[in-house]
Amino acid sequence: MKHIIPVLLIALLAACSPKKETAESPEKPFARSVWNKEQANQWYQDKPWYAGANFNPSTAINQLETWQADSFNPEVIDRELAWAEGIGMNLMRVYLHHLAWEQDPEGFKKRMDQYLSIADQHGVSTMFVFFDDCWNNTYAAGVQPDPKVGTHNSGWVQDPGQLIYDSPEKMMDLEAYVKDVLKHFADDKRILLWDLYNEPGNSGYGDRSMPLLKNVFQWGREVNPSQPLSAGVWNFKLTKLNKFQLENSDVITYHNYQDSATHAQMIDSLQQYGKPLLCTEYMARTRNSTFEAIMPMLKENKIAAINWGLVAGKSNTIYAWDTPIESGEEPEVWFHDIFRQDGSVYSQEEIDLIKELTSAD
């Protein structure tokens, strides 16, 4: 997702240093406390190094087209996750949407279970994402729009987006959604982690996203699933949001689309928390965030490496954020993604590197 990471991480260091309990520290309202360093590292110590992608099927323009009953496509999911398995990937980050659940809660969970069964057959664990502040702020159920030619993520939708500001009473419905899904899958070993909120504060929301961010962590603690809860930091100008995210995440997740030097600075800053790190978004070729530059560094530090995009398709994420190509021709340098829809690859050199790092045959 589009965002800005400053070169200097002063804001993070100043506002988000590991929390020290003081007499003034208010008691957290959560049903269980955040994992401490020992708990987090105990969870991670026997885990493999994870490498994977943010995954939505190439035939889906957004989360709704992925999960609605009429467009859910297990055949495409199976085929594309087989390609991921073939290059040694073992983790996918997958976005949900409350509107797909709202239409059909039981059917939605059955489709989630079907996806998980397919992923598990390919040796792939899953990280699900609940809320998202990126791209289009309104949406509707039913048939989704066609992609805009040559335009990055033209149909991706926020969740809940503008709805929560127009109808604050929807907070209760969002609580029901989150708790229903978490309770149903609370002990599902196919799920590695719950990513509660993607890039809170994006799209100009800033601190307006704080109430939902606080609520979704509270709802998660009240359900108390066996999997860790997290929300990734992505823009260190959002100091209040960052502070809350880092203090309330069981393990630390983050996004970085910058070059290796800037990414290394971010790693150094986040390692002070002493918890496992998972990079849940990276790899934007034209911004020097490439597999060659970043993936070996992540493996060396046992940081999960989850790039944006597996198969080029309706999301149009081969095109850069702010550089549409009106003709729709394929850019010389893809921004995101690895495979074409026929299974051919953008770069065999990248595939060779990924397979070397993941020890895939």
Predicted regions and their residues:
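Active-site mouth of glycoside hydrolases
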Residues: K28-S249, H255, S260-T262, Y273, ...
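Structured C-terminal subdomain patch of bacterial secreted/periplasmic proteins
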Residues: T323-P324
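Sec-dependent signal peptide recognition
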Residues: M1-L9
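Bacterial signal peptide processing site
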Residues: S17-K19
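Catalytic domains of carbohydrate-active enzymes that cleave complex glycans
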Residues: E356-D361
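C-terminal motif of bacterial Sec signal peptides marking the signal peptidase cleavage site
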Residues: L12-A15
